[in-house]
């Protein structure tokens, strides 16, 4: 007897059965779909913590806050992370947004120069430059199919025109890789949250499991910050946490420290 199987859709009143081959429908992937899938893999890789951009060398002022006795327990740590996210959203998200919407060299240079003038302490300024230059170097080496990344690095490397600040570079690269504007801004907040909480584990404020729990809990606050500060122009960029800015500036004066900033 010939083997038969029922299709997923309801059978007719005559309980008709069909051959399995009749139920199979194959669609050949189009070139557009294939390229879109490849783009998704690139986007995920850009957010992977294994990408050697130097983010884990910076504590966003957390180490200075600990030594100043301003962050001593998980509750104070959560408050600190939220303040970092608020300040990141208000000050840096406009640069990420604008660079993503216009991922070209001319716009990026203007944004980089403006952010250079706006950063008010030397420690955070150097951290931004270090992470930005590392991110561009890695992106140009990894995403070789995007020629403009290599062109940017070769053109401006060693010049004094730009400082390679992290926020504009991040927005630019995300735009070239295929992120939309809102996803790019949310991704930047995620990377910031991830790195601050990672720094907390290495400072023994919390353990790895508690860090994962905290990241899940703070995600709601991070999304609220995204909705509050997204899609703003750089003329609206502002510092919302002057105390955090002062703490970051104190890092260079600590006698012993684990992080660069």
Curated annotation (Swiss-Prot):
Cited function: Required for the maturation and activation of urease via the functional incorporation of the urease nickel metallocenter.
Organism: Oryza sativa subsp. indica
Family to which the UniProt record says this protein belongs: Belongs to the UreF family.
Xref: Gene3D superfamilies: Urease accessory protein UreF
Phylogenetic classification of the source organism: Eukaryota, Viridiplantae, Streptophyta, Embryophyta, Tracheophyta
GO molecular function: nickel cation binding
Name used for this protein in its record: Urease accessory protein F
Any Pfam family: UreF
Subunit description: URED, UREF and UREG may form a complex that acts as a GTP-hydrolysis-dependent molecular chaperone, activating the urease apoprotein.
Cross-referenced HAMAP family: UreF
Keyword terms: Chaperone, Nickel insertion
Any Gene Ontology biological process: protein maturation
InterPro entries: UreF (IPR002639), UreF_sf (IPR038277)
